[in-house]
Amino acid sequence: MAIKSTEKHTPMMQQYLRLKSENPDILLFYRMGDFYELFYDDAKRASQLLEISLTKRGSSAGEPIPMAGIPYHAVEGYLAKLVQQGESVAICEQVGDPATSKGPVERKVVRIVTPGTVTDEALLPERFDNLIAAIYHHKGQFGYATLDITSGRFKVSEPNTEEAMLAELQRTAPTELLFSEDFEPVHLLEKRNGNRRRPVWEFELDTAKQQLNNQFGTRDLVGFGVEKAEFGLCAAGCLIQYVKDTQRTTLPHIRSIIMDHQDDSVILDAATRRNLEITQNLAGGFNHTLAEILDHTSTAMGSRLLKRWLHQPVRTHDVLNQRLDAIGELKESGLFADMAPQLKNIGDVERILARLALRSARPRDLARLRNALQQLPELSQTTQEFQQDHLLTLAASAQPIDSICELLERAIKENPPVVIRDGGVLADGYNEELDQWRDLANGATQYLEKLEQEERERHDIDTLKVGYNNVHGFYIQISKGQSHKAPAHYVRRQTLKNAERYIIPELKEHEDKVLNSKSKALAIEKRLWEELFDQLLPHLEQLQSMANAISELDVLSNLAERADTLNYCRPVLTKETGINIEGGRHPVVEQVMSDPFIANPIKLNPDRKMLIITGPNMGGKSTYMRQTALIALMAHVGCYVPADSAEIGTLDRIFTRIGASDDLASGRSTFMVEMTETANILHNATKHSLVLMDEIGRGTSTYDGLSLAWASAEWLATKINAMTLFATHYFELTELPNLFTGLANVHLDAVEHGDEIAFMHAVQEGAANKSYGLAVASLAGVPKSVIKKAKQKLQHLESGQVPVPATSTTVKEEHQLSLIPEISEVEEALAHVNPDDLTPRQALEELYRLKALL
């Protein structure tokens, strides 16, 4: 919007342009009566994003003004749509009195709604965190800060590589991300909504320290343990400045900053989070994820805490055993069943407290807070039976807070209106002065009923009624048929089609008295409402501790219920390297299968650090690998696991290289994606890592693929010594255990019955003898005639009777690996086919290609 001067514009438009110049990069909702209106480029953009009409509102400076508008009462729904698309909005309200204003009514921006700083219930995902983050980069090092404004949770970290930074962005998934104008690795910001460019000076260290000390009321940051994290502090300083600018109020619920140390967590990179489908499936949904199975929490704040645990598994055994002990007690005592309904009635206190801190809480927020506090005595009765130390600590923080509960019981009506604007929120008896003015206003109703009856009888007019509207105030209405009976002192105020309306001095006097008492009562109520915040805010820290304790009790109670219902066992955590699972099951697959799940063991230790896994397509190799990783992850969350028994050793990272698809947006092929993920593993895995490798090398020629798979497996086994599950269709790799120590072959078998195949899904020692590719192709619906032809050709290939076209020229491949027998072009092409990855159309095209090679 290029506006050089505002002088040629109307006074109202001059006011709009001034406010817009103060908020140039975001949409401005400009209040006009019962509408919020947008002009110029904002109007065009809003009409596209919200699918609303784009019109014109007169002209200014000789040009028509593009305009779009939305009703003020529907603003929350439109804000939700914009926030979901990564947009920010400045809300401009009328703050002046139209009756006393000369020129346009005074307006100002009262709040700025951004994706990462929303606190309104209607704009937030209930069971997921809503984070705002800031990222700082300097000479290959990163600083990263995140804030959940709905809880005050403020964290900082310093990822030391782009790969680690990308993993943090994937884990935290901020809805809004601040970065400096000179930020270099911009590819990290691609495919994201809510990116916000900020001035470089906002990331300066001295400015950041000053901002943070001002927020926390401290002289330095030593007490928080973050004083040496200079890059992280640069990001945190920008973040806290931005939040203050948008909220336009103090932030009393943000009282500390926490350093996230990588050494404390089991690190999951972006590919691993995606492949394990922790909280999001491969299609981007929530169905059939680990969180869907484990999250039966009673409160939304408990649900959010559980997801944080799942995305940040910890390595500290003391913390994990503390959680496991608590779950064990709740499970064995059956107390989880008593706690669930009590917790459900408490609700999402965490976010109510954030709105209280920002003084944006609505009447029903405080009513819900009151209702939550009323549940604590019953919950306290249940928690008295706790014996485990951590449960007792949580129970102590979740004790009833009688003073706050009593205050809210006295102050707030049982079912208050949505907003304070029209009053009727504070309970009768809370304030004597308010009651007196309310009584005066309410007594008016009785007076009017009495006046109506007296006037009707005095003048013998049975259609006479006393009424009120906002335009004409109080009036006496008489039907047209009886209007001739109206006495002389009745002054006509309004003529309707079927009635006449009058005013009398007595009624006018009463009107002034009533309106004055109502406005006086409303003014007192609004003042008392603000004073109520002043009484509650000193208790904010205690209330937040209570909310945090209830969240964790909810998660632990939920995990106890899941362990009991789903027949999970307690994992044993050891300091040694290794994984030993008996009767392991995939937590998600076993719940969605109609047939019984086949449980399988796994044993990994320094003498058996790599398993070469072979077997048919659809035989269960990927499921077996994923269930191992998920059980290890669940153990490091501190919850029970789907197994008969599980012994889980020290883990620093979990890597997965399972499946791949073209990354067309970045110009990367399937094979390029596969090799990038493999390179990441080979560079970053350690002897304490768990590595899952599935079908390495299948995206290129047989020789290249086998060479890469062999070399990768050998490197992991001999140089890194990582605990590795290596699934492959290259049967040549089953020779590896004969060449190197610490490797073993296992396979998943299948049984053929004529033309049918039955997958056993049971893991057995040793290598598989065939992959049953044609049987799987038949199951996939490849035409029987094609399968028949393929069987014939397979027999030819296996017997070496491969016809060579007269026109073909045999080219001997140089530098062939000694372990690979010389094979024909058709044989190579067949080995490269993986029916699991083919659509019916692709399968048909592949068969045509095979035929052309004969």
Curated annotation (Swiss-Prot):
SUPFAM superfamilies: DNA repair protein MutS, domain I, DNA repair protein MutS, domain II, DNA repair protein MutS, domain III, P-loop containing nucleoside triphosphate hydrolases. Transmembrane segments: none annotated. GO terms for cellular component: cytosol. InterPro entries: DNA_mismatch_repair_MutS, DNA_mismatch_repair_MutS-lik_N, DNA_mismatch_repair_MutS/MSH, DNA_mismatch_repair_MutS_C, DNA_mismatch_repair_MutS_clamp, DNA_mismatch_repair_MutS_core, DNA_mismatch_repair_MutS_N, DNA_mismatch_repair_MutS_sf. Keywords: ATP-binding, DNA damage, DNA repair, DNA-binding, Nucleotide-binding. It comes from the Bacteria. The keyword DNA-binding applies. Signal peptide: none annotated. One of its GO terms (molecular function) is mismatched DNA binding. GO terms for biological process: mismatch repair. Pfam families: MutS_I (PF01624), MutS_II (PF05188), MutS_III (PF05192), MutS_IV (PF05190), MutS_V (PF00488). SMART domains: MUTSac, MUTSd. ATP binds at residues 615-622. The keyword Cytoplasm does not apply. This protein is involved in the repair of mismatches in DNA. It is possible that it carries out the mismatch recognition step. This protein has a weak ATPase activity. PANTHER family: DNA MISMATCH REPAIR PROTEIN MSH1, MITOCHONDRIAL (PTHR11361:SF34), DNA MISMATCH REPAIR PROTEIN MUTS FAMILY MEMBER (PTHR11361). Belongs to the DNA mismatch repair MutS family. This is DNA mismatch repair protein MutS. It comes from Aliivibrio fischeri (strain ATCC 700601 / ES114) (Vibrio fischeri). The lineage of its organism: Bacteria, Pseudomonadati, Pseudomonadota, Gammaproteobacteria, Vibrionales.
